Amino acid sequence: MLRRPPVLVKVEGRFVPQRVTLEEVDAAWASLCARNPRYFDGPVLQVLGVSRNGHGGVQIHVQESSYRFIAVSALGLDCGARPVGVKGIVESDGRVLIGRRSRSVAHYPGAWEFVPGGTLEPGEAPDAAIAREFAEEARLALSAPPVAVAVLFDTAVSSWEIVYRLAADVRELPEVGWEYDEFRLVAPEELAGVRDLSGCARQMKPIAFASA
């Protein structure tokens, strides 16, 4: 658990995989885009290393890279990409917001996870990113600033995730979109019975109803 927000340290240059050729990456990327036109090769941050700073926080060293190096892992092409993302646990009146991933997404289709979440973009502060993701995915605003509580590694998708505790007044469930096909607000006992949680959600589960 974090006692202070993580610090991102940007390393100059651009991450390019060494273990595979760019021709292999381009061919795999073209195959993915043919299957799902929603794929977009945007800028991402590659994690070079994560270390504790001795003050209840962590330093995350990052370098700019491209999303295609992450995406092609779905076809078994490991570029060594390790992106950094943000995840939020939204609490509203003693319940937390979860969503079921649609079949159109690249990772965890059909699995339940905490909403919101997304990949951190270069130049964007992590707390601003999680607020943006919440606005995009739930079309709602936060009622208090995000609080960073943990940094996790999602082994299923090889990504580092900064986890935030979020507060919002969720009076009605968000409308579904292309990323999620169902939303729920669940109490602790209900969350325990939810099957098909994503790997990252299972790691976040003990944090969900812990004391803030």
Question: Which residues are covered by each model-predicted region?
Answer:
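N-terminal leader/linker segments that precede catalytic domains of diphosphate-processing enzymes
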Residues: 1-111, 118-132, 140-172, 197, ...
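Structural detector for helix-capping/boundary residues
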Residues: 132-133, 189
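Short alpha-helical functional segments enriched in proximate histidine and acidic residues
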Residues: 137
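NUDIX/MutT-family hydrolases
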Residues: 174-206
